[in-house]
């Protein structure tokens, strides 16, 4: 079996908003990497045995006395090191150079003139003139290196930053003041490939097929002939976990699909057809709609609704698990960002992936071992694996759907009548987005039920019915978002269909709020 962890890159996080992006780019190249806090110990680095190390950017200033520093062992480990932005500055400082606060903070596009050939920039040039190589890059820094460490040379300059890149070719130490991990740096991926593959010598074995083979082998080794239970929602993460486990242990996997009455139109039937009929999984459908809606009756506060939905799910799932007396393991769809976020919430920083991560919320008396086949993977990697396992692209690339489902898309109190109306309206909206080619152009689109009535006219009579709001946004990272400028004729068609086909809706509006100040979801 291919050893996909044999060659690996260690990324030390100094707090940049782009650090996870570095990890995703390295994985995209085909090499495994992990993201750790900057203050790891020498022992931890030795045990991990990285093939190369990347020092990330960060918001601190190396001119401050107590600013973060890389462990000294990083520069004595005998492996290549790449410093990015703050990572370059701390490398320079720690190896005997100098940094200063810059008179001109650089933020945005810049052109770096390349000089003194270096392996890091091999075959890279954004300039049409081969004799004057330049790179179009993205800068974001307030400090700059003003004196090189011994044995370093300048490999890149800008008009305001005389040392925009540096290298010590003998020790294979490299620094860039810009961010190669962002797409604004045109040759960023090629630069990282030069470092990871050509300089560090990593083999590109981190592929979907190899990851699947490795995950299946590890599941078999972990659970043996034991039985495993999984809460299958039909979302990407739990679906991929289900197929990996099914491939590894077959009928020893017990999937529980809790139909809470808060799903999209026909979604429950689609989940059963996909995983029960098509893939042949051992799956139980629990109709818990009345139980969820009963607990939600009279509750209008969004946070209270979320907590109720979470608690009822745990209770229902626990009731089902008690019927399976031989189950020894609980499978979860924990992914790598969950691990990083969980560690950061406890310690204030990302930490080693191997430290145990348990998503809270399940009762203490469920004394089951934890199986988390996706805990090393980013979301985009999970999607690639899903496609390789045979999940349809339409499902893999579906827009995000909140955990509480329609419970937070029906504003205020949740009632069956409201959910039924919203389901049908939302299905029309999504259908028309797909038909017009706009579904793929938007990052997230959905309908919201407003618990207010509005007067309308139908035929010769007046009607006094409910209001639906349509929401569609475009975003890269879901941290900020712009409302999608859908064509008027498309919005008109959706509105007409909803009002004519969904009895009980008299008015349709379109949400043109960005994030910030609004959030993407209404609740």
From Swiss-Prot:
Top enzyme category: ligase
Q: What is this protein called?
A: GMP synthase [glutamine-hydrolyzing]
Main function? Catalyzes the synthesis of GMP from XMP.
Q: Subunit notes for this chain? A: Homodimer.
Q: In which pathway does it act?
A: Purine metabolism; GMP biosynthesis; GMP from XMP (L-Gln route): step 1/1
**What SUPFAM superfamilies does the entry give?**
Adenine nucleotide alpha hydrolases-like, Class I glutamine amidotransferase-like, GMP synthetase C-terminal dimerisation domain
Organism of this sequence = Haemophilus influenzae (strain PittGG)
Q: Which PROSITE patterns match?
A: GATASE_TYPE_1 (PS51273), GMPS_ATP_PPASE (PS51553)
Enzymatic reactions: XMP + L-glutamine + ATP + H2O = GMP + L-glutamate + AMP + diphosphate + 2 H(+)
């Amino acid at each position: 079996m291919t050893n996909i962890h044999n060659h690996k890159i260690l990324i030390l996080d100094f707090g940049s908003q782009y650090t996870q992006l570095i990890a995703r780019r390295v994985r995209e190249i085909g090499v495994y990497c992990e993201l750790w806090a900057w203050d790891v110990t020498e022992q931890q680095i030795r045990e991990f045995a990285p093939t190369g190390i990347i020092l990330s950017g960060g918001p601190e200033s190396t001119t401050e006395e107590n600013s973060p520093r890389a462990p000294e062992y990083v520069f004595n480990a005998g492996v290549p090191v790449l410093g990015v932005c703050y990572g370059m500055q701390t490398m320079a400082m720690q190896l005997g150079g100098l940094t200063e606060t810059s008179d001109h903070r650089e933020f945005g596009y810049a052109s770096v003139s390349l000089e003194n050939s270096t392996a890091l920039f091999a075959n890279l040039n954004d300039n049409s003139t081969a004799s004057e190589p330049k790179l179009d890059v993205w800068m974001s820094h307030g400090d700059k290196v003003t004196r090189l460490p011994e044995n370093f040379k300048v490999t890149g300059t800008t008009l305001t930053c005389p040392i925009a890149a540096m290298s010590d070719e003998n020790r294979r130490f490299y620094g860039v003041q810009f961010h190669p991990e962002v797409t604004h740096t045109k040759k960023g991926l090629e630069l990282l490939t030069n470092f990871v593959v050509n300089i560090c010598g990593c083999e590109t074995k981190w592929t979907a097929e190899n990851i699947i083979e490795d995950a299946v082998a590890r599941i078999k080794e972990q659970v043996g002939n034991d039985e495993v239970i999984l809460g299958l929602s039909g979302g990407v993460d739990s679906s991929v976990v289900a197929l990996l486990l099914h491939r590894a242990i077959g009928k020893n996997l017990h999937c529980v699909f809790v139909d809470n009455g808060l799903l999209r139109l026909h979604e429950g039937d689609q989940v059963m057809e996909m995983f029960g009929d098509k893939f042949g999984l051992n799956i139980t459908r629990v109709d818990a709609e009345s139980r969820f809606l009963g607990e939600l009756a009279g509750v209008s506060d969004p946070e209270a609704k979320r907590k109720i939905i979470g608690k009822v799910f745990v209770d229902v799932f626990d009731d089902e698990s008690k019927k399976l007396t031989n189950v020894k393991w609980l499978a979860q769809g924990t992914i790598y960002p969950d691990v990083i976020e969980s560690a950061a919430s406890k310690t204030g920083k990302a930490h080693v992936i191997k430290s145990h991560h348990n998503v809270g919320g399940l009762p203490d008396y469920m004394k089951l071992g934890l199986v988390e086949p996706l805990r090393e993977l980013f979301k985009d990697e999970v999607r690639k694996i899903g496609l390789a396992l045979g999940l349809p692209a339409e499902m893999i690339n579906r827009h995000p759907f909140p955990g509480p489902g329609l419970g937070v898309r029906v504003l205020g109190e949740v009632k069956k009548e409201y959910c039924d109306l919203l389901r049908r309206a939302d299905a029309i909206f999504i259908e028309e987005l797909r038909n017009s080619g706009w579904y793929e152009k938007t990052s997230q689109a959905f309908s919201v039920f407003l618990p207010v009535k509005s007067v309308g006219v139908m035929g010769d009579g007046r009607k006094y019915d409910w209001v639906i709001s349509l929401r569609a946004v475009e975003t890269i990272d879901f941290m900020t978002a712009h409302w999608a400028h859908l064509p008027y004729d498309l919005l008109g068609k959706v509105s007409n269909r909803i009002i004519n086909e969904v009895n009980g809706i008299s008015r349709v509006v379109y949400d043109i709020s960005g994030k910030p100040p609004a959030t993407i979801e209404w609740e």
